[in-house]
């Protein structure tokens, strides 16, 4: 207990020779040991602060986060927790090393360092994914894949759970019931409307890049969802160098969902003229 209480209040180290008092040949139990450390920094309060941040970090995972500022705040708290944990680990390790007590905690520190390295590598990979997607969403969302397409106005990047043969992209204008926002939705994720869709999208992962081509659309009158358009993409098996980009409106390469349908006779599955 004395050992852990001393470590809990560690600070700047003053090396002193260890002493054992009140020890006699007749008594091998009752003795007072002086640990050669003196505290000048409230290290224990720093540990308590990190523990409270870790509890808050874990508790925040059960709260539904929908807005971007909430996601950014949550990720910022996680980053602060990780940095404080790294600081506490290195600081306490140096103190124990100077005190000559490192061997007792070597395996614990090795495990903590390995976990920190894994966390740092994951952060680097997410940054690389941001560069591939031209968006900050890989840092905000924990998804492994992202559906991306790029226009002159905006770089779209929507989280996706796995690689599938078909992607269904929903577009709504928010005017009727069931009310859909004026945005693009895939699964439970959405992106605000800034520009139209393109006739091909790409799924980006850490080591994955899969291309999908627009195959067909379903209009709102075909599905029962008012004022919504569904864009259906199918996976391409061709190489990216052989993908031919077809524009639906003949010029811009994007589709504006607010435009009137350009099809003569919409059916349940209206094919897009390519």
From Swiss-Prot:
Residues 1-34, 100-104 are extracellular. Glycans are attached at residues 27-28, 32, 34. This is Protein 3. The chain crosses the membrane at residues 35-55, 79-99, 105-125. GO terms for cellular component: extracellular region; host cell Golgi membrane; host cell plasma membrane; membrane; virion component. Homotetramer composed of two homodimers linked non covalently. Interacts with M, S and E proteins. Also interacts with the accessory protein 7a. It is found in: Virion; Host Golgi apparatus membrane; Host cell membrane; Secreted. The record marks 133 as: Involved in polymerization. It is a multi-pass membrane protein. One of its GO terms (molecular function) is monoatomic ion channel activity. The second or the third transmembrane region are responsible for Golgi localization. It comes from the Viruses. Forms homotetrameric potassium sensitive ion channels (viroporin) and may modulate virus release. Up-regulates expression of fibrinogen subunits FGA, FGB and FGG in host lung epithelial cells. Induces apoptosis in cell culture. Down-regulates the type 1 interferon receptor by inducing serine phosphorylation within the IFN alpha-receptor subunit 1 (IFNAR1) degradation motif and increasing IFNAR1 ubiquitination. Residues 56-78, 126-274 are cytoplasmic. Bat coronavirus rp3 is highly similar to SARS-CoV (SARS-like). PROSITE patterns: COV_VIROPORIN_3A_CD, COV_VIROPORIN_3A_TM. Exists in both O-glycosylated and non-glycosylated forms. The glycosylated form is associated with the virion.
